Design a protein with these regions (language model features):
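Conserved N-terminal phosphate-binding loop of PLP-dependent enzymes in the Aspartate aminotransferase
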Residues: 1-318
Length: 318
């Protein structure tokens, strides 16, 4: 295993180790994996290549042109597209989030695993966001598909700076043939936080509680949308539920956040469920959301806004 202090670093380390383990250096990826050169180089071919992978509008200034045609994005759940990419671009590494808002369909993850086995491609799962939220490991365990390397962060240290790269011994051993180092990777706070977090995860059965509350939140959204006849699309895992308004999404989302803040609730259409969400929190949240949905159903929300309509989610603004 290797440890870093941030997810971007961990992703870059995983790519380095994987490339050291294969003759085929090109990467096919799906999802958001940080700011490093290997990832942003995908936009050299087209500035819109990364737009469908969480964060849009990313410039590649400062990325060497010779990295062009080394990293290629593919759409989630589109196995046919991925298969063609593998054939045409001599892919040696597949890097992806197991899932974010949309669940895998038509046995997608198993198909990816199978083609990796067949073509001798290294499969890396980025579990920085999903790890330890669905179980005491990665969400890939729920789908019974194992990667060659996996990356964990965020919940790993309960907010403290620590990320981990783990994987098959044969591949991880290749890290000895390249140079991977940082002065601050040796600090001890993150490691202690991770070990303490594991103890609390086990003692409090954290993932069971947050999944239970996440399902309650999804039901709240469903019930209120039906009550007020507001069409919404509910997605995501139980631990990280998300919904979108099918009409005037950004305007309604802005109003929702505005009204929640008035009641001292920090909330939007996405919830990272945590252990401290309790019945009283959910009761207050439901009461405010009921009022918000009622006002949205009446229309003219724009007149009730106290600020500009928010940007597209995760859209680059600097």
């Amino acid at each position: 295993s290797k440890f870093t202090r941030s997810g971007g670093e961990a992703n870059a380390v995983a790519i380095r180790i994987a490339r050291a383990s294969t003759e085929k250096k090109n990467v096919a990826f799906c999802g958001y994996h940080g700011w490093h050169d290997w990832y942003l180089s995908a936009n050299i071919n087209s500035k819109k290549n990364l737009d469908q992978h969480l964060m849009s509008g990313l410039n590649y200034d400062g990325i060497p042109q010779n990295l062009k045609n080394t990293s290629f994005p593919f759409p989630y759940n589109d196995f046919k597209y991925l298969s063609k990419l593998i054939s045409k671009k001599n892919i040696g590494i597949i890097k992806m989030e197991v899932m974010r808002s949309i669940k895998p369909q038509d046995n997608f993850l198993q198909k990816v695993r199978n083609i990796c086995n067949k073509k001798k491609i290294i499969l890396i799962f980025d579990e920085c966001t999903t790890g330890y939220r669905e179980n005491m490991g990665g969400i890939h365990l729920n789908f019974k598909v194992n990667p060659d390397l996996a990356i964990f962060g965020k919940a790993l240290g309960s907010g403290f700076a620590i990320n981990a790269i783990i994987g098959k011994r044969k591949i991880m051993k290749k890290a000895e043939n390249t140079f991977i180092s940082s002065t601050f990777w040796g600090e001890r706070v993150g490691y202690v936080a991770a070990l303490s977090s594991f103890k609390e995860f086990e003692r409090l059965k954290v993932f069971k509680k947050i999944n239970k509350n996440g399902k309650i939140i999804k039901n709240i959204w469903s019930d209120l949308s039906k009550k007020h006849k507001i069409p919404i699309n509910i997605m995501g895992t139980s631990a990280i539920p998300i919904f979108e308004f099918l009409n005037n999404h950004l305007q309604n989302k802005t109003y929702l956040t505005q009204e929640m803040l008035k009641e001292k609730i920090l909330a939007t259409n996405l919830v990272y469920v945590n252990i401290f969400h309790n019945k009283n929190n959910l009761k207050k949240y439901t009461k405010v959301l009921d009022r918000v949905f009622n006002n949205i159903s009446r229309g003219n929300i724009k007149k009730l806004l106290n600020s500009k309509i928010c940007f597209k989610p995760i859209n680059r603004i600097n």
